[in-house]
Amino acid sequence: MKKEAASCDYIICADGGVKWAITNNIDPDMIVGDLDSISDTLLFYYQRKNIPIQSYPKDKDETDTHIAITIALQKGASEITILGGIGNRMDHSMGNILLLIRIAQKGVKAKLVNQNNVIFVSNKRIFLDAEPGNILSILPYGDNVKIHQTYGLQYPIINRVLPIDFPFGISNIITEKQAWIDIESGWIVFILVKE
């Protein structure tokens, strides 16, 4: 994840993300959130470095990650990478996956990355940036999700609906360097497993 962060032009830490940033010697460009996961010592450290900090109330509709994404979109981001947004809190992890759709609906490319997975969404043809042998799970987001055709997968999917209650798209395997998936309708959540 440190390599991913180093390739970013602008880093917004959502609350507790600053703990990861300081551990990995990465200075964020901005810190946002209700700041309930940051010690006063850490806040003071970043204030002394003149890093902008935007504090929000604890009682709010948006998560701290949602706020960070909104700011990134307002700043004109063309691509958003959410680091560490998959963790012990399944509710936050699921919420962050749903935020990928919000970002994509704005026409911005986005992915959610942790040590083991890269998660992204699409509702149109997508070319995969992965190596043969990588595991790819293909999950529908909602009803009426249909794949027109796939290329470069061990288990091809051709003109098939992906039922929300029968996840047959789990653990497919990429077989070609130029793999792609042509989505006919609906949104799909892709999980690329890093092993």
Give short role names for the model-derived ranges:
Residues S122-E195:
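Long, charged alpha-helical interface segments
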Residues Y56, V113-Q115, T150:
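Conserved beta-strand termini and adjacent loop/short-helix elements that scaffold enzyme active sites
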Residues D15, L83-G84, V113-N114, L139, ...:
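Short beta-strand segments
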Residues I51, Q74, R102-V108, D143, ...:
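Generic secondary-structure signature for well-ordered alpha-helical cores
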Residues R89-S93, I119-S122, I157:
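Short, well-ordered, mixed-charge alpha-helical segments that flank or form enzyme active sites
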Residues I97-E131:
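A contiguous pocket-lining binding segment that forms or flanks enzyme active sites
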Residues E4-Y10, G16-A104:
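Acidic/Gly/His-enriched mid-domain segments of enzyme catalytic cores or analogous surface patches
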Residues D9-Y10, D29-M30, I51-P52, E79-T81, ...:
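Structural motif
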